[in-house]
């Protein structure tokens, strides 16, 4: 398993009294929709399950590279590599050095919005938007694995979702979503802009021009035209954009022109992808589809990666927006992904050249993932909330254990709590860990499921006089409530903790004696972890935490 090192302590240990040791962490996914064996030559959707939104893709020779948005999590913008579009391996992150960004004080759904990856003349380029933390930027590298350059800011470019296009003559252009010219006509009225881009100075040059005002039909008041990408095929320039907002009305539209500057005419069959016209209440729904990026294969076929979500009820999903893959059909010079009313398939025929036996774990399908904390650096799946300002995670001081140094910044803060999270990738899952009891009072530690600072669970343990108590706290809004607690004996044996999910219901268990799991709270309504209730753009993450105890009844 590839490893990364930006979260690990090297030389600045915190006070030993604040240290809590974790022996292992395990995540198991058991979604019924993934239980059916794959037919030979087929793959599963999503190809990246869990909080992997806003995919962008490029091809270099026979290899494909893909990036996703991460918002206020760190490291930022994972970079994946594949040889067949189905099996992906994370090879790096565009932002993994602490000095590159500062997310302090930001909500979890601010920070790193959608990025775009392209390759030109032996170099990779990623452009993106660090919302409320610098704005639009460009970074580059000779290898997708990095190291990536420092971020070069683009102060003259407003809006979000920048994307680079390289024409056949080598000219570079920067597209982005921005305000329309003049006064917006309605809420959600945006425009797609384009400007030449100088790769030597990493800055746009020359005049900017609106390529698309509002959407494909301004009279219908389309909202949130965004995620623009430009492609060239058979003498046409194709402009593809997301329209309708990243929710149930999400869609993808396409336009084309003989001239890179336009004018661009819409396809006769827009949108080329949406799920908004499907029946509500259908079994195993996939919704919110859009934010497409296209890529061609060496044999001339085209494929689309895009985001979509898997609700467990209504528009509630705790897994966030995920990355899906579908083939593109070209008809009469226009691309099409799905016809109107067609559902996104969970199983589809794999691209040409994919091995007959497909194993997409641990990024799709049902699987068990375990970290025994045996390596000196964290596995790439681990994320922190915002950029660490101190070294609170340590895999070196005690080999085979993860030591977290408790911090006063808790899960409800907009700072950097001592919390390592991995993405919840299934609606039916079990996450568990084993830890030693904190050596002193005033420290809570355990296992957390986090959506944002006002939506999380913490299943933990704290010293209480001569004993200890196991508790489960729930944050729903601005108040933290203890759902259940029970006293346990103080022993030297590790305490096991478990959070399990069944759609919108989560259960919490512990084992303090080695004699088996005991339920602390069962079937609690966890819909506050869904985007529909919590707001924002991220999915849930789950993992170990340690914090210095504040007043437990404090209300923010």
Language model features: what each stretch is:
Residues 1-11:
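N-terminal export signals
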Residues 12-556:
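Carbohydrate-active catalytic/glycan-binding domains of CAZyme proteins
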């Amino acid at each position: 398993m590839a490893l990364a090192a930006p979260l690990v302590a090297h030389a600045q240990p915190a006070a030993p009294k604040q240290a809590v040791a974790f022996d292992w962490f395990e995540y198991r996914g058991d979604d019924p929709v993934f239980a059916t064996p794959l037919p030979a030559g087929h793959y599963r959707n999503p190809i990246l399950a869990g909080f992997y939104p806003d995919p962008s893709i490029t091809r270099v020779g026979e290899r494909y590279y893909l990036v996703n948005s991460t918002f206020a999590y760190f490291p930022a913008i994972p970079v994946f590599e594949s040889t067949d579009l189905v099996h992906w391996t994370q090879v790096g992150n565009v932002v993994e050095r602490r000095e590159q960004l500062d997310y302090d004080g930001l909500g979890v759904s601010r920070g790193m919005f959608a990025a775009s990856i392209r390759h030109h003349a032996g170099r990779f380029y990623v452009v993106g938007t660090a919302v409320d933390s610098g704005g639009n930027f460009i970074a580059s590298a000779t290898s997708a694995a990095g190291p990536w350059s420092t971020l070069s800011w683009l102060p003259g470019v407003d809006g979000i979702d920048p994307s680079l296009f390289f024409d056949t003559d080598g000219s570079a252009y920067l597209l982005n979503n921005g305000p329309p010219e003049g006064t917006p006509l309605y809420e959600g009225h945006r425009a797609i802009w384009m400007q030449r881009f100088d790769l030597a100075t990493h800055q746009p040059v020359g005049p900017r021009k609106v390529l698309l005002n509002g959407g494909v039909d301004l009279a219908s008041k389309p909202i949130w035209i965004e995620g623009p990408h430009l492609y060239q095929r058979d003498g046409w320039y194709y402009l593809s954009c997301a329209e309708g907002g990243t929710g149930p009305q999400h869609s993808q539209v396409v336009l084309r022109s003989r001239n890179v500057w336009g004018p661009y005419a819409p396809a006769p069959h827009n949108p080329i992808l949406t799920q908004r016209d499907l029946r509500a209440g259908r079994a195993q729904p996939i919704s919110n589809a859009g934010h497409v990026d296209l890529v061609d294969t060496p044999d001339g076929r085209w494929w689309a990666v895009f985001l979509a979500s898997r609700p467990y009820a209504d528009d509630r999903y705790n897994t966030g927006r995920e990355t899906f893959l579908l083939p593109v059909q070209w008809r009469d010079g226009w691309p099409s992904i799905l016809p109107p009313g067609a559902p996104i398939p969970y199983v589809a025929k794999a691209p040409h050249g994919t091995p007959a036996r497909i194993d997409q774990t641990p990024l799709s399908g049902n699987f068990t993932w375990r970290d025994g904390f045996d390596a000196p650096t964290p596995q790439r799946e681990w994320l922190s909330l915002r950029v660490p300002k101190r070294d609170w995670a340590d895999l070196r001081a005690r080999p085979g254990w993860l030591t977290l140094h408790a911090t006063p910044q808790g899960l409800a803060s907009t700072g950097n709590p001592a919390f390592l999270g991995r993405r919840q990738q299934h609606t039916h899952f079990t996450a568990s860990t084993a830890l030693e009891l904190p050596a002193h009072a005033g420290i809570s530690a355990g296992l957390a499921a986090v959506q944002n600072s006002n939506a999380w669970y913490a299943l933990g343990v704290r010293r209480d006089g001569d004993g200890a108590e196991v508790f489960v706290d729930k944050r729903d809004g601005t108040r933290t409530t203890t759902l259940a607690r029970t006293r346990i004996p103080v022993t030297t044996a590790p305490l096991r903790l478990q959070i399990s999910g069944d759609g919108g219901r989560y259960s919490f268990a512990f084992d303090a004696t080695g004699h088996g799991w005991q339920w602390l709270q069962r079937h609690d309504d966890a819909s506050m972890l869904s985007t529909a209730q919590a707001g924002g753009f991220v999915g849930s993450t789950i993992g170990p935490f340690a914090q210095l105890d504040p007043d437990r009844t404090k209300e923010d």
